[in-house]
Amino acid sequence: MKDKVRVPFSPDHPSCAPKLFTISAPAGAGKTTLVRMLAQEFPDSFQKTLSLTTRAPRPEEVSGIDYWFVSQEEFKQRLDSNNFLEWVLLFGEYYGTSRLEIDEIWKSGKHAVAVIDVEGALSLKSKIPTVTIFISAPSQEELERRLKYRGSEQDSQRQERLQHSLIEQAASNQFEYVIINDDLQKSYEILKSIFIAEEHRNVL
């Protein structure tokens, strides 16, 4: 078995101050799988933020692990209380990132990793320092194949997501890093190298 390597972390060095990473991608591009792999290899260095959402969980999803699944009423109450650093309405459902959750991850000495949509990532970037990463499928045909294989959307929903992916793809040039996920392991190694490089980036 290959030994797990921990990313060096020294809170006393300015380059190692906890950071916020955002990972965005069209549905089906593989961002969730890649982030899960990262969390498994580096549990002491990185922690995924949990977005709040009003959408229904998929069969394999668990509240408190994948998202915080809440009612629209609760989401709007939190929105009125200014609990969100960013929020969006996407495909008729609300998604939001809590500033408190990011702060708690930072206090634990870990980097925060937010897996959020393109609009949310760019919104965060405009408010606080953020390392932005975009994951792309190699083609629209491959993206459609993955969505069909996932089987969590009706045909009309899948087509809506595919159309939206064109908008997301067009915004990829606003991200610092772009990974084309045509091979999962290769893409993971690229993602890991980005995190390690950012861990050692000097603050000038």
Swiss-Prot record:
Write down the InterPro entries for this protein, in alphabetical order. Answer: GK/Ca_channel_bsu, Guanylate_kin-like_dom, Guanylate_kinase, Guanylate_kinase_CS, P-loop_NTPase
User: Could you state one GO cellular component term attached to this entry?
Assistant: cytosol
List positions binding ATP.
A25, P26, A27, G28, A29, G30, K31, T32
What are the record keywords, sorted? ATP-binding, Cytoplasm, Kinase, Nucleotide-binding, Transferase
Taxonomy, superkingdom: Bacteria
Listed EC numbers: 2.7.4.8
Localization, UniProt: Cytoplasm
Q: Which molecular function GO terms apply here?
A: ATP binding; guanylate kinase activity
State the family named in the UniProt similarity comment for this chain.
Belongs to the guanylate kinase family.
Write down what this protein is called.
Answer: Guanylate kinase
Organism of this sequence? Chlamydia caviae (strain ATCC VR-813 / DSM 19441 / 03DC25 / GPIC) (Chlamydophila caviae)
